[in-house]
């Protein structure tokens, strides 16, 4: 039995992939440890959306090489950076043993055991004995389906597709994740049913561009897209209370999806709606396929059908050629929409993407100035939106203790607002009415009034360690309070939605 340390950089899809890897390792008798210093195996699941994420992973792996002075340790890079850099990573990290790409997560446990066996024999550091697998795998989209749930866990990610065909000019995701591939609806529904049987009450459906699910594999039915058909099928699962999805693309928001927020009560009032820029000129250069006017029209259509809709977004500042006029257009659109929150990132060159070769690159100093200016506007809107909840009662799914004070509980509203409140362990897994008493920029605080006095439904059993795979890779630079950071939002390293779509 080996002790395995897994650290994840990047989006929710990466977190879900890490969970799959952990589940397979546990099934083979290995132990997942949160303590890197006691690990026999170190796996870093990587992100390539921005250079900062890659540098963090490379730096971490370099530092952890010191463990091998104490005992044999297997080191592996997984995921997007592994896919994009491949065998070249061995030149940067000499002690590396494994490089496994985005379509081979289901092979990681096997490769780890091969490397462990090799380490137990005569010492061999030659790169020829290392394992590299970044090849395409048919039907790999169906390989991420098993879960490692903690005791009393009530939310889960469900991967419904892989890949992206949009080829935005700034984005490396189509190169690291491949073309769009979707799982069958019945397979996804079966996974959700198994999760509900184990105590899960909320699922988040994941895809690089999640609302384009199934467009190449499955037909429309009565004007409903395959994604809306999937939402309807998941909605019919007994015992499930909430459905979320991320990350969509504006091009996939058609009338049937907008109306689904009204017709499907389990579909929560929150949408992450990537903008990237408020300038039509920059949107064309990004190959985003919509205009600022079209984006605002979609926002208005969504809010007409669902007035309580919470909206978050992704924005890139300093894209090549961005002028002050372009940036002011972005600020104006942000002010027009009034987002509940936004992940704001400085443009990062990605190798082999069209934008990287543009000569008119924006200076780093100007990127930083625009980043801070836009963040001030975003944070102001976040505070205003949250202040509007003071004195109101909201429905909260209680997820567990606050990470800074186990005597307090935390959960999320249907609009994905973090709420911290006083309560008891029996509230975990329950839907509660919480009266909001005060708010910070990113967290609501309140007093509970349970919807039901009865016992909560059966919760996930067992003693498996709840895995903590999260590490943001973004560039949002606000200053949330200590409670905000601990309960899932640190704006100094704001995690992007999937692939920063």
PLM segments and residue spans:
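Proteins enriched for Cys/Gly/acidic motifs involved in redox and nucleic-acid/cofactor modification
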Residues: 1-213, 226, 256, 261, ...
């Amino acid at each position: 039995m080996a002790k395995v340390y897994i650290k994840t950089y990047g989006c929710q899809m990466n977190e879900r992939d890490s969970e799959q890897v952990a589940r397979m390792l546990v099934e083979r008798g290995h132990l997942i440890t949160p303590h890197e210093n006691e690990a026999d195996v170190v796996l870093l699941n990587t992100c390539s959306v921005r250079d900062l994420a890659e540098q963090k992973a490379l730096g971490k792996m370099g530092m952890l090489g010191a463990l091998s002075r104490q005992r044999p340790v297997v080191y592996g890079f997984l995921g997007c950076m592994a896919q994009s850099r491949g065998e070249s990573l061995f030149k940067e990290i000499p002690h590396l043993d494994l490089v496994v790409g985005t379509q081979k997560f289901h092979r990681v446990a096997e490769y780890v055991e091969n490397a462990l066996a090799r380490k137990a024999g005569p010492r061999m550091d030659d790169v020829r004995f290392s394992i590299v697998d970044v090849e395409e795998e048919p039907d790999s989209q169906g390989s991420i389906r098993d879960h490692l749930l903690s005791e009393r866990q009530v939310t889960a990610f469900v991967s419904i597709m892989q890949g992206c065909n949009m080829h935005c000019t700034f984005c490396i995701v189509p190169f690291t994740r491949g073309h769009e591939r979707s799982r069958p609806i019945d397979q996804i529904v079966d996974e959700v049913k198994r999760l509900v049987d184990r105590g899960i009450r909320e699922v988040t459906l994941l895809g690089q561009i999640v609302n384009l699910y199934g467009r190449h594999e499955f037909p429309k039915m009565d004007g409903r897209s395959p994604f809306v058909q999937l939402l309807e099928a998941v909605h019919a699962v007994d015992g499930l209370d909430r459905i979320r999805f991320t990350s969509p693309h504006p091009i996939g928001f058609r009338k049937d999806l907008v109306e689904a927020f009204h017709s499907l009560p389990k579909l929560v009032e929150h949408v992450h709606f990537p903008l990237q820029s408020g300038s039509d000129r920059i949107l064309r250069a990004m190959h985003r396929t919509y205009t600022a006017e079209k984006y605002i029209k979609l926002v208005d259509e969504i809010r007409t059908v669902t007035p309580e809709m919470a909206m978050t977004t992704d924005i890139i500042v300093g894209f090549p050629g961005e002028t002050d006029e372009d940036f002011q257009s972005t600020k104006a659109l942000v002010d027009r929409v009034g987002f509940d929150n936004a992940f704001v990132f400085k443009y990062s060159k990605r190798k082999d993407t069209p934008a990287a070769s543009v000569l008119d690159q924006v200076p780093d100093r100007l990127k930083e100035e625009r980043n801070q200016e836009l963040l001030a506007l975003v944070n102001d809107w976040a505070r205003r939106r949250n202040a509007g909840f003071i004195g109101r009662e909201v429905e909260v799914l209680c997820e567990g203790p606050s990470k800074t004070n186990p005597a307090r509980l935390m959960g999320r509203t249907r609009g994905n607002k973090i709420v911290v409140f006083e309560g008891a362990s029996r509230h975990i897994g329950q839907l509660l009415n919480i009266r909001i008493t005060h708010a910070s920029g990113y967290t609501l605080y309140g007093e509970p009034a349970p919807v039901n006095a009865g016992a909560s439904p059966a919760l996930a059993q067992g003693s498996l360690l709840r895995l903590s795979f999260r590490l943001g890779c973004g560039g949002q630079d606000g200053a949330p309070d200590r409670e905000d950071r601990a309960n899932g939002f640190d704006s100094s390293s704001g995690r992007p939605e999937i692939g920063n779509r």
